[in-house]
C-alpha cells in the first residue's frame, strides 16, 4: 500500500433508493474509474474501500422490524458474493413512523492489472435489503455508496 501513497485519489458514488421493501429488493451498479482515453500511458487501479450509509423509515404499531443491508461484489468467476452486512431495524409502541440509519466502511484493497489507456476499470456491485422480520411495503431505505480508488500510472 505504501507504493500507492502518492497516486491520484478518485471516488465513485451511487445512490440506491428502495421506496418500499419487496421480496426481492436488490439494485446493481458499477464502480468505474472513468479514465478511458484520458491518459496516454497504462495504469493500475487500487479499489481501496467502499463506504455504505443508509437512512430509512417504517410505519406501524407495536412493530418490530429487523434486517440487513448487504453489499455484494461480482468476483472474477462471475458470481456476486457478499462483502458484508449492516444491520437495520427498530421498534414502535404506537402508530407512528420509526426511523433507522447506519453506516460502515468495507476495506477492499483490490488491485487491477495494468489497464490500457483505452479501457476503464470497473467492478459490479449490488445492494440487497435482507428482510429478517417485518421489512415490507411500509418500509423504505435509501443507501449511499462511495468507492475510493487510487490510480497509478
Curated annotation (Swiss-Prot):
Localization (cell): Host nucleus; Host cytoplasm
GO cellular component terms given for this protein: host cell cytoplasm; host cell nucleus
Coiled coil (UniProt feature): none
InterPro entries cross-referenced by the UniProt entry: Nanovirus_C8 (IPR008706)
Signal peptide span: none
Keywords assigned: Host cytoplasm, Host nucleus
Function: Putative nuclear shuttle protein.
Family, similarity comment: Belongs to the nanoviridae nuclear shuttle protein family.
Protein name: Putative nuclear shuttle protein
